[in-house]
Structure formats: structure tokens, C-alpha cells
């Protein structure tokens, strides 16, 4: 439902090989970082099948390199394989949670679980995401490989999950947080114990989704 899941530098030698020498991919010895970097190049060009191959090779090269799993998780989401997306994100998180781009993983998990209709898991990962994001010290998270995806999208997933779980008070709070963080003066105060109030919350969710998709 979203426009879903920084380093895209590729060494000159690898880049020239890929551009000018057919079928040379198997004749070079690339590091896991170079393999993952080129996977991101393919990802940013919307070539997700190729991206999957490069991230897969990077994982085979080094099973402990976090950005390979990150790339694979986001790529599988674009290939409509949300269960595989969850697998790669969670597989690495089971090994390590101390790396710098961890918010990418929890954002990706939030989107993937939402796509699977697992609202409780989606909300849990949203909560972990916001628990680890420090807006005082750092600007709000945005996905470095698609700057249109940011922490407001994660907040929307949280609000949608809360609505589906009938946590309407929490949903309203999340909606208001999105408006506040977006610089809007809108304040939602619905009687969510009524059908009309819940319907109005759903309308706000749809409006915010459209605004974020078109921002």
C-alpha cells in the first residue's frame, strides 16, 4: 500500500566490467560490500530480479554482512514476497542488532508484516522502530535508497495496524502524530466508540496515505 522498502558507490573496475565486458560477472572477485552495493544500484533502477541475485551473492560471500540482508529484505518486498522479506530481516536481527542502519530493518519488517496482514507484528515492529529512533539527536529516518519513504510511512503503518486491531484510541494518537510531524495544524478528536467516529478515522488514514504517496 505504500511506495514500498547509502551507499550505492561501485568501484570503477567493477562498473567498467559490468558495462563493457559481457558475461564477466563471474570472472571478477568482488567483496561482499561491492556485491551489495551493485545490488542497490539495481534496486534503485527498479531491477529487482537482478538486485536479488547480487544481494544473494553478497550473502553467500559473507553471511554476517548486514547490508546484504537489508537489500534482500527490501527487494523481496518489491517482488511481492513479503514472507521472504520478513525471513531475511529477522534472520540477520537474530545474529546482530548493533549495526548503524537498524531502522531500515524495522521499517522493512513493519511494511512486510502489514502486507501479510499480520497487524500485531506490524505494530510491534513500528513500536520498536520508534523506540530506537531519536528525533532529538537526529532528523527523522528516511530510506537512503528511496528518499520518499520515511518515518511518517512507518507511523501510518502503525496507525493502520491499530485501526485493524480495534485499538482506536491508539490509532487516533498515531494519526495526530503524523499530522503534527508533517507540520499540519489538524487535530483529530473523534468519538471512536461510534461507527461514525471510526469511519472518520478510516477517512483520515486514507487521506494521509494519499498525501504521503504524493509527497
List PLM regions with ranges:
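Terminal, low-structured helical/coil segments at or just beyond the last alpha-helical repeat
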Residues: 148-215
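Alpha-helical segment of the N-proximal tetratricopeptide repeat
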Residues: 30-57, 61
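Start-of-helix register in tetratricopeptide repeats
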Residues: 33, 67, 74, 101-104, ...
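Register position in tetratricopeptide repeats
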Residues: 44-45, 78-79, 112-115, 164
Amino acid at each position: 500500500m505504500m511506495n514500498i522498502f547509502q551507499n550505492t558507490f561501485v568501484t570503477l573496475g567493477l562498473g567498467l566490467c559490468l558495462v563493457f565486458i559481457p558475461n564477466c560477472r563471474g570472472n571478477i572477485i568482488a567483496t561482499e560490500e561491492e556485491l551489495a552495493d551493485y545490488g542497490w544500484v539495481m534496486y534503485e533502477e527498479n531491477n529487482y530480479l537482478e538486485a536479488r541475485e547480487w544481494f544473494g551473492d553478497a550473502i553467500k560471500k559473507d553471511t554476517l554482512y548486514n547490508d546484504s540482508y537489508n537489500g534482500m529484505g527490501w527487494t523481496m518486498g518489491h517482488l511481492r514476497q513479503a514472507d521472504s522479506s520478513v525471513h531475511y530481516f529477522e534472520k540477520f536481527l537474530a545474529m546482530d542488532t548493533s549495526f548503524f542502519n537498524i531502522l531500515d530493518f524495522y521499517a522493512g519488517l513493519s511494511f512486510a508484516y502489514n502486507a501479510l496482514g499480520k497487524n500485531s507484528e506490524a505494530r510491534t515492529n513500528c513500536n520498536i522502530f520508534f523506540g530506537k529512533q531519536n528525533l532529538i539527536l537526529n532528523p527523522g529516518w528516511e530510506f537512503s535508497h528511496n528518499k520518499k519513504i520515511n518515518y511518517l510511512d512507518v507511523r501510518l503503518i502503525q496507525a493502520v495496524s491499530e485501526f485493524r486491531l480495534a485499538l482506536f484510541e491508539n490509532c487516533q494518537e498515531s494519526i495526530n502524530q503524523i499530522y503534527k510531524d508533517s507540520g499540519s495544524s489538524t487535530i483529530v478528536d473523534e468519538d471512536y466508540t461510534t461507527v461514525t467516529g471510526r469511519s472518520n478515522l478510516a477517512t483520515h488514514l486514507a487521506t494521509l496515505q494519499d498525501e504521503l504517496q504524493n509527497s
